[in-house]
Each structure stands twice: as C-alpha cells, then as structure tokens.
Amino acid sequence: LSTALGYIDAQYKRFVTNIAGVPTDVADFRRVQNTPKWTASGTLAYSAPVGDGDISFGTTLSYRSKTNQFEIPNPYIDQKGFALWDASLVYTAPEGRWSLGVFGKNLTDKHYKTSGYTFINVNPVTGVPILGTNGLPTSALGTEGTLTAFYGNPRTVSATLELRF
C-alpha cells in the first residue's frame, strides 16, 4: 500500500501587463498554468505464490484538482478536477522464465484535457471571453477563432508476454 498527497498554493503576487498603454496589475485575475492545487494517489499491490509461480495484482487511483491551461482562465479549455483508475494482473512462471500480464489504464474512460490553445478575444483584465452577437467567442485571428483542446488517452487495455532466455 502506498499513498501520496500534494498541495501547492501557487499564485501571482504581481502580474503587470500594459492595458491601453497603462501598466496594470492583473494578478487577481491570473492563474499559474498547469498547476493543480491538489494531487493525490493511492496504490494497492499484492503478490502471492501460485504453484511454483507468482501472481501480482496492482491498482492505482490518482486525482488531480482543477488545472488552468493558461494564466488567463478559460472556461472552454480549463480542466476540472478528475480521477483516473489503473490496474494490472501479472502471472510470473517459476524462476521468472516468462510472464503474462494484463494492464488497464483509465479504466473508467474519463475524458480529460491535458492542454489546449486559445485564440479568442478576452477582456484584458479579467480574461472573460468576449462573445459575439451569435453567443460564441469572437476571434483574435481574423474571421475564425481557434479554440483547441487536447485530451488524455481513453481507456486502454493491453496484454504482455515476456520471455527470458
């Protein structure tokens, strides 16, 4: 059994940017990117003899709190807190000559963002997206705005066969 817990209170004391030519401290409206306040994980591993071989089981649950992709919060690409569950089962033959394993990652098939890009207009102080008459964010790159999110891997299950000679 192993556990880990992480906490970081990352924030800007000052974040000065020029708004209409005037140096303005916008620290209250900025976030340290890719820095969750909380992270946690717990792993349970068990191994037992089976005949002359060995069987091992492991499972891990990990958590990451809300993450901002950029200094300016963006409701479209920032990631809310989420948990991932992984597990494995491995049989190892006598004397370690071979092993057979099954591994699962993101077993709940959680959809989560790992990064993203945004080229939409925002209020320079608060970072709130500026919406057009159609209710959609207005573009910072001409006629088309770009808002792209990249997602983590979906549920994956794999098997391994290892031979030692």
Question: Where would I find each of the regions flagged by the language model?
Answer:
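Gram-negative outer-membrane beta-barrel transporters
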Residues: 1-71, 160-164
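Outer-membrane beta-barrel proteins
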Residues: 26-32, 47-49, 75-77, 90, ...
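Residues that define the transmembrane beta-barrel architecture of outer-membrane proteins
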Residues: 36-40, 81-85, 153-157
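Feature captures outer-membrane beta-barrel proteins of Gram-negative bacteria and organelles
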Residues: 40-42, 87-89, 124-126
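Mobile, glycine-rich extracellular loop/lid and propeptide segments
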Residues: 44, 86, 96-99
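Amphipathic alpha-helical protein-interaction segments enriched in hydrophobic
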Residues: 57, 86-87
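C-terminal beta-signal and adjacent terminal beta-strands/loops
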Residues: 62-70, 91-165
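Generic long, charged, amphipathic alpha-helical segments
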Residues: 72-73, 82
